[in-house]
C-alpha cells in the first residue's frame, strides 16, 4: 500500500495468488477474483474513480476452464496442455489443421478453447466492474483476432492469436 488517499481516485494493482482450480470454471474464476475485490473494498481502496489493474496472462489460464479434474493436479504447463488436447481430441484435431502459429499444438489448444475462455473472462470482469463500481484493466488473455463490437469482445477464429487485455468500465462495458 503506497501513497495517500487524496480523494481523486486511485490505481490499484492486484496480483492474485492463484491455484489451477481457480481456472476450472467461470464460477471458480469469479469467486477467486471477487475475493480480492472484496478485500480491497473492505480496506477502503475502491471508489468510483478506482482503476484496478490485473497481471498479464491472468485470463490466458482460462484455457483450463471446464476440463477434467485431473488437469488441475498436473505439475507442468506442458502436461496440462497435452491433457487438454487429448481430452478434446476431435476438436483439437480440427483446430490443429487450422493452426497458424509456430507451435501448432499450442495454437490449436487456444483456438479450440477460445470461446469458453472468452465467456468466462468477459462475464467475470463485466460482473466485477458492475458489482464494485470500478474500471478494470483485466489481465491479458490469448485469443484469435479479438475485436470489441458494441461493448463486447468478439472473436475471429481464422485470425492470428493475440495476447490482449480488455478494459471494463464501471458499467461492465
Regions found by a protein language model. Name each.
Residues 1-173:
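Hydrophobic structural segments
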